[in-house]
Each structure stands twice: as structure tokens, then as C-alpha cells.
Amino acid sequence: MAIVKCKPTSAGRRFVVKVVNQELHKGAPYAPLLEKKSKSGGRNNNGRITTRHIGGGHKQHYRLVDFRRNKDGIPATVERIEYDPNRTAHIALLKYADGERRYIIAPKGVVAGDQLISGVNAPIKAGNTLPLRNIPVGSTIHGVELKPGKGAQIARSAGASAQLVAREGAYVTLRLRSGEMRKVLADCRATLGEVSNSEHSLRSLGKAGAKRWRGVRPTVRGVAMNPVDHPHGGGEGRTSGGRHPVSPWGFPTKGAKTRSNKRTDNMIVRRRK
């Protein structure tokens, strides 16, 4: 992977920083694993905006990614690594020995031609998926399940990983990238290694239009609005808002705690930093 800084031949190119990966597949994706993806523009079935800053963007197909990795004991060959517009990580197309193909989140270091396998007795190798009880303590993992059989939910974005730091009884303890220490059932599965495309955070889109290509609309500051539109709005001249930061609906923001899931509080050994 190479980090390319564009020459400032125009204002729109001046701040562009690209991440170029020569190993990515340059052709079309695997058609049987594609689904139609329609855009909502951030509106619900009443036509009202439920999520701000969404609209436009390039048309996309959804890639059906296998988050369960439940095809046990059957070796698979990595056919190619592909770009996926729906996520920051790359995806890998696997061809199993019985002929079936599936997409998975591409682990770091896995290239076309590699052999991967999942199951209880899978070897300890990047890209293989095992139950947490069979993974050595200290291992770096990604794609971790929270409920056995539900599919990966933790550490799925570009460069993400977690570390298995302890095993006790029916649970293992994970250290997440946020600093949180969390208990997870040992029967849950995880994939060894970290997620690919860790250089994603180094890129710079360079101009507002590149955000619009991705379906992201502008964000207007509350202090630039009128009082009818935002709690921070109004005032003569420029103001600081006059109160602690809140959302357009008056809820505290910018650091205010929002977690309210008491049911799983006992699973968190240490809160995130």
C-alpha cells in the first residue's frame, strides 16, 4: 500500500491524499453476492428527516459479507481482495473446496492464494476463525461475536482489532481499541489478526465535493442558526452559544455520556477511556 499526495494542480487537488493498493481487484464484484441498495436520503416512511447530513452520493450495490464464518472444516482459497463502498475495510472473496464463494472482511496480510479455514480445530493463523475458548491468550483478533452464532459485531472497521487478555470459566476478557475491557462468552467466535486497510485514517478527501460523492451533506453549526432552529441560535453578532453544547433537541453533547444499557453493564470490566 502506498500513500500518494497529489500535486496541487487545482484547488480541489491541493489537499488530496490517497491510499493506493495495487493488490485490489480492478474488475467487477462477484454478482451472485450483490444486492440492491436503495438510498433513503436520511428520511423515514413519512418523508421526514430522521438522520441529518445524508443525501445524494454514488449508486452502490451491497456486498453480502459472511460475518458468521460457520462453514467449518472446509478449506477456502482467497481468490482476490476487493474494495467495498459500504465499509472502510477491504473484503476478500473466498472459494471453498466445495465450490461455494463467500465474501469476508479481509484480514491484514491476507493476499490472493492464501488458504483459510474456520472451526474448532483451525490452526492459529491470521484469517482463520475459531471459538474464543480455542484462541491463545494474548492473541490479536477481530470480527468478534457478542452472542454465539449471531455473527461478528466487534472490531470490523479498517485497522480495527481487539486483544484476548484473559480466560476464566465460561467467559473471556477482551481489551478493545477504545480501552474498554469487556467479558464475552467463550463460545463466541472471532477471527485471528487485525482488519485490513489500516492506512484508511491517513487519507484526505481534499474537498467538500468528495464528501458529496459519498452521500454526506454539509453540517451547519448551531450558533450559525436562528433561535427557532437550534438552542445555540440567535444573538447579536457572533456568540459562543451561551450554554454547554447541546443537540438541536436540547440533549447534552460533545462528551456527555449516552450509554444506558444496564442489562450488559456487568459485562464491562473497565469503561472506555
UniProtKB/Swiss-Prot annotation:
Give the matching InterPro entries. Answer: NA-bd_OB-fold (IPR012340), Rib_uL2_dom2 (IPR014722), Ribosomal_uL2 (IPR002171), Ribosomal_uL2_bac/org-type (IPR005880), Ribosomal_uL2_C (IPR022669), Ribosomal_uL2_CS (IPR022671), Ribosomal_uL2_dom3 (IPR014726), Ribosomal_uL2_RNA-bd_dom (IPR022666)
Keyword Ribonucleoprotein found: yes
Q: Which UniProt keywords apply?
A: Ribonucleoprotein, Ribosomal protein, RNA-binding, rRNA-binding
Q: GO molecular-function annotation terms? A: rRNA binding; structural constituent of ribosome; transferase activity
Q: Does the keyword RNA-binding apply?
A: yes
Cite the Pfam families for this sequence. Answer: Ribosomal_L2, Ribosomal_L2_C
Coiled-coil intervals: none
Question: Might you name a Gene Ontology BP term for this protein?
Answer: cytoplasmic translation
Which Gene Ontology CC terms are recorded? large ribosomal subunit
Q: Where is the segment annotated Disordered? A: 34-54, 223-273
Q: Which NCBIfam families match?
A: rplB_bact
Q: Which HAMAP family match?
A: Ribosomal_uL2_B (MF_01320_B)
- Please give the subunit comment from the record: Part of the 50S ribosomal subunit. Forms a bridge to the 30S subunit in the 70S ribosome.
Of which family is this protein a member? Belongs to the universal ribosomal protein uL2 family.
Q: Function of this protein?
A: One of the primary rRNA binding proteins. Required for association of the 30S and 50S subunits to form the 70S ribosome, for tRNA binding and peptide bond formation. It has been suggested to have peptidyltransferase activity; this is somewhat controversial. Makes several contacts with the 16S rRNA in the 70S ribosome.
Please give the name of this protein: Large ribosomal subunit protein uL2
